[in-house]
């Protein structure tokens, strides 16, 4: 467990701590900029290959496309649990099973779901879960926290 000031810092720390030069990462088009920006920077500066699984017309993750993209040699799969763009939830246990089948790590952005959705890291097979204490869990921040 690692406490950071916010989800953006947690996601940046996790992504930069796991991904190495030349690695391959799979993510989705449903991600927040706190995932996309560090991945884009790693692609530009560290020769990291970043693949993006799409979604259907209703904004739901295309699991078939994700499974095609998650191949041996994939270092990490970075995925949201609930999209801030579409509001759709992602079956993170299903994603974790795909990732672990090829030896990839799973980094989950649970900023929109932690505190309101059940997340069992062990049962779901999640390696890293990042979230904020100010949403869903009703933790106050600042001098009155």
Where are these regions (language model features)?
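Pyridoxal 5′-phosphate
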Residues: 1-145
């Amino acid at each position: 467990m690692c406490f950071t000031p916010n989800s953006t810092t947690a996601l940046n720390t996790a992504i930069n701590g796991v991904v190495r030069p030349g690695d391959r990462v799979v993510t989705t088009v449903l991600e927040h900029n706190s995932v996309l920006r560090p991945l884009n920077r790693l692609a530009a500066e560290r020769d990291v290959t970043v693949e993006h699984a799409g979604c259907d017309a209703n904004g739901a993750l295309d699991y078939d496309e994700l499974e095609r993209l998650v191949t041996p040699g994939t270092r990490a799969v970075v995925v949201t649990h609930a999209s801030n763009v579409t509001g759709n939830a992602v079956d993170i246990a299903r994603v974790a099973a795909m990732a672990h089948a090829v030896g990839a790590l799973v980094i989950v952005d649970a900023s929109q779901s932690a505190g309101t959705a059940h997340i069992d890291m062990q049962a779901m097979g999640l390696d890293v879960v990042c979230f904020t204490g100010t949403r869903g869990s009703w933790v106050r921040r600042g001098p009155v926290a």
